A protein has these predicted regions:
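Conserved acetyl-CoA-binding loop of GNAT-fold acetyltransferases
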Residues: 117-126
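Conserved beta-strand in the GNAT
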Residues: 47, 53-62, 66-74
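A conserved beta-turn-beta hairpin within the catalytic core of GNAT-like acetyltransferases
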Residues: 62-71, 80, 130-135
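Conserved acetyl-CoA-binding loop-helix of GNAT-fold acetyltransferases
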Residues: 75, 81-94
Length: 143
């Protein structure tokens, strides 16, 4: 059974880190010190699991202007295209909405823009940044 949860238990946070190491550090050859550089002990995550096995994740943050940010979206390669990532994004949106957030931003890799657009996010092409595999465009959605 596919389920998205707010990762508050240790096994859930371990699942989050497993996904990020596999999807980003192994998948894109990103050193862990860079992949986890802006995480803190207070970082909040959504974990999507299939019968307890971690398959997708994203980090959730609210900034000083009360805008929500969904960051570090990652899905294990063999689970991509099967709606796990979308379930995680929707769970993150629900968590942010419960906290009074009405505007959400996701900095998307250019190659993933279509995924976020299907979920109702609008790209702002004036925010293009990065290079190579990591050319990114900021997207936003009003709840």
């Amino acid at each position: 059974m596919m389920e998205a949860v707010h990762a508050t238990e240790e096994w859930q946070r371990a699942g989050v880190h497993y996904i990020r190491i596999q999807a980003m550090c192994v998948g894109f050859d990103i050193p862990p010190r860079y992949e986890f550089a802006d995480d803190t002990k207070d970082s909040e995550y959504i974990l999507v699991h299939e019968n307890g096995f971690p398959v997708s994740t994203c980090r959730v943050r609210i900034d000083e202007e009360n805008a929500g940010h969904i960051e570090r979206v990652a899905t294990l390669e063999e689970y991509r295209g099967k709606h796990y990532g979308a379930l995680g994004i929707k769970a993150a949106e629900q968590l942010l909405k419960k906290r009074g957030v009405t505007n959400i931003r996701i900095n998307s890799r250019e190659k993933a823009l279509g995924f976020y657009e299907k979920l109702g996010y609008t790209p702002d092409f004036s925010t293009r940044s990065g290079e190579g595999e990591f050319v990114c465009i900021m997207t936003s959605k009003t709840l």
